[in-house]
Every structure is written in structure tokens, then in C-alpha cells.
Amino acid sequence: MMQPLYLVGPRGCGKTTIGMALAQATGFRFADTDRWLQSHVQMSVADIVEKEGWGGFRARETAALEAVSAPSTVVATGGGIILTEYNRRYMHRVGVVIYLCAPVSTLVNRLEAEPEAELRPTLTGKPLSEEVREVLEQRDALYRETAHYIIDATKTPAQVVSEIIAALPPSTQRLQGDVYT
């Protein structure tokens, strides 16, 4: 059994999309902390934040992180999971942390194209491009500090998955046919 693989990065970097594809390529299970949390409390992230504030949401997010962390699991985390020092240390110690890095323009384009965009609470109350830029400026150093690997997430999901697999130790990779994928 391999330690969990944690995908971190801002909204729109592809954590869920890449996570599902990476799980399929490695034969790992897939978990998403936001989806796990929403299914267990039967509320959207926006509703949790509205009822409990960001502090309440962050506490629930830590519980979700611990609940989904298991060997041979790819975990897509919420964009702000790295704001809690415990979460950063936990992921770095327990698993392999992969920062999916993308520029503001890519993130904004992806977020604008997302059908679930209205379910995500605004973090600053500002226009999307301004919010993404500010949030990334605040969090980039934390993503980098937490990550074992930093991967360019501007490419296609298949290319990103291939780059992640190439960066990981061979014991993480699943042999498909005669080649590692």
C-alpha cells in the first residue's frame, strides 16, 4: 500500500479532474474533501460558510481530510486547506503532496466555465479575476511549502497525470501493459 497522494492548489487548477484521472491511472481510490464534507453534512460549502463561518468550515475541512486519508488514495483537497497549519503538516507527513500550479488567467477561464461556480462562496467579495489573483498571491507560498512536487496544471488532464506519475517513485506507478502510465 502506498501513502495517499494529496492534490493542492487554488480553485480551478483541476484538483478533482486530475485526481479522478490519476486515481484511475494508478489504481488508487479517489476522494474529494469538499464532496465528502458536503455529503456528510448535506449542505453546500456556501451553506456551511453562511451558517458556521469560515472558521467552522475550516474545522470541518480538517475532519474531512483526516476521514478520507487512507493508503493508496488520491485526495483532491479544497483550495484553502493549506491555510490551516495542521493540515499542511499532516498532508506533508502522511502522504505525497502535489501542487497543481496554474496562472491566474487559466484559473479564471476554468472557473467561469464551471457550472457549479455559484455554489462556491466568494472569498473576497471582489470580481473573479481580482479575487483569484489576490487569493493566489496569499496562498502560493503555502502551496509551495507544503508540496513535495509542483506540477504545471495548464496542460491537458492526461498530460498532467503523466507528469505526476513520472515525478512519483516507481512504487506508486501502476504497470499497464508494458509501460507505466
From Swiss-Prot:
Tell me the CDD domains matching this sequence: SK
Cofactor(s) needed, names only, are: Mg(2+)
The segments labelled LID domain in the record are 112-126
Q: Where in the cell is it found?
A: Cytoplasm
Cofactor binding annotation: Binds 1 Mg(2+) ion per subunit.
Annotated EC: 2.7.1.71
- What Gene Ontology terms for biological process does this UniProt record contain? amino acid biosynthetic process; aromatic amino acid family biosynthetic process; chorismate biosynthetic process
Q: Write down the SUPFAM superfamilies for this protein, in alphabetical order.
A: P-loop containing nucleoside triphosphate hydrolases (SSF52540)
Q: Which Pfam families match?
A: SKI
Catalytic activity entry: shikimate + ATP = 3-phosphoshikimate + ADP + H(+)
Keywords recorded for this protein, A-Z = Amino-acid biosynthesis, Aromatic amino acid biosynthesis, ATP-binding, Cytoplasm, Kinase, Magnesium, Metal-binding, Nucleotide-binding, Transferase
InterPro entries for the chain: P-loop_NTPase, Shikimate/glucono_kinase, Shikimate_kinase/TSH1, Shikimate_kinase_2, Shikimate_kinase_CS
Stored PROSITE patterns: SHIKIMATE_KINASE
Looking at the record's lineage, which domain of life comes first?
Bacteria
Molecular function (Gene Ontology), one example: shikimate kinase activity
This protein's record includes keyword Cell division: no
- Where does the chain bind ATP? G12, C13, G14, K15, T16, T17, R120
Family stated for the protein in its record = Belongs to the shikimate kinase family. AroL subfamily.
Quaternary structure and interacting proteins, as annotated: Monomer.
Spell out the PANTHER family in the cross-references.
SHIKIMATE KINASE, SHIKIMATE KINASE 2
Q: What does this protein do?
A: Catalyzes the specific phosphorylation of the 3-hydroxyl group of shikimic acid using ATP as a cosubstrate.
Question: What does the domain comment read?
Answer: The LID domain closes over the active site upon ATP binding.
What protein am I looking at? Answer: Shikimate kinase 2
Q: What is the lineage of its organism?
A: Bacteria, Pseudomonadati, Pseudomonadota, Gammaproteobacteria, Enterobacterales
Gene giving rise to this polypeptide: aroL
